[in-house]
Amino acid sequence: MAAPRCCVLWRVCGRGWWRATGHCRLPGCHRSWPWATLGTRSLSQEKRAAETHFGFETVSEGEKGSKVYQVFENVAKKYDLMNDMMSLGIHRAWKDLLIRKMHPLPGTQLLDMAGGTGDIAFRFLSYVQAQHQRRQRRQLRTQQNLSWEEIAKKYQNEEDSLGGSLATVCDINREMLKVGKQKALDQGHTAGLAWVLGDAEELPFDDDSFDVYTIAFGIRNVTHIDQALQEAHRVLKPGGRFLCLEFGQVNDPLISRLYDLYSFQVIPVIGEVIAGDWKSYQYLVESIRKFPNQEDFKDMIEDAGFQRVTYENLTTGIVAIHSGFKL
């Protein structure tokens, strides 16, 4: 059951204040008030701590958030088409594999973070619907005494074709969500979907709410990846699974050289021709190179509290699927 609105506001605002104040020195707390250590830190250290990267550019943390928002606001309407063009359609196979690796059953509660255009959510719904229909057929086969009319009526009376499954699509960008909602209507996905405007670093959901958390090609755009991972861990139920599909680092020198050539010389040109936006796709290419390699990202997932963390390289490591469990 969803929390009352007042509780949600407290969760969002209250938790944000709690983090901002750094907790306290009361028994059981492990962090001091932020001003307790300011005297020992130089202004240059404070400045560096507030800096991050936007592609290859060094920017303030606040500036990165607004820049990333602008990128996806600009590309939202051409986002899916550009994915097809940039990957030659291979991204579809990667996402299909992510769903097969998840193997969701009817009743699964999914949170798809940074999932604005709905690619993962729609695949999830199609998969669980097929699973639910297979389960129904098995059940009907065991009821040998039913007539065909009774079987047909039983199917007609089935109101929930998803077996109670729900895909919650959460994205920080309104334009991406707008595109996803329109796609859902166009593709006939009318049930089992929820659309939420939210920040990966401060999710507007209760603890232990979801069975699976997915994020596909989104986590490298987050300013504080460690906070996003901690939030993923928080909102998953005990036993829940974290799955991340993201670009990786290619180890083969020859393939890496060809990949760099294609990424830096071809993708921005495609972005300019198809979407009329060179700079946004230049950033997206640079953001891939700034993202941690597969082993380092695995360590970050473990640091967030996940266990049994593994990853699988796809297409020679151009992308990888990382998996972890909240145990």
Swiss-Prot record:
Does Zinc count among this protein's keywords?
no
Transit peptide, residues from-to: 1-49
GO MF terms, alphabetically ordered: 2-methoxy-6-polyprenyl-1,4-benzoquinol methyltransferase activity
Q: Which SUPFAM superfamilies match?
A: S-adenosyl-L-methionine-dependent methyltransferases (SSF53335)
Identify the InterPro entries for this entry. Answer: SAM-dependent_MTases_sf, UbiE/COQ5_MeTrFase, UbiE/COQ5_MeTrFase_CS
Q: What GO terms fall under cellular component here?
A: extrinsic component of mitochondrial inner membrane; mitochondrial inner membrane; mitochondrial matrix; mitochondrion; ubiquinone biosynthesis complex
**Compartment(s) of residence:** Mitochondrion inner membrane
Question: Which protein is depicted?
Answer: 2-methoxy-6-polyprenyl-1,4-benzoquinol methylase, mitochondrial
Source organism? Mus musculus (Mouse)
Name of encoding gene? Coq5
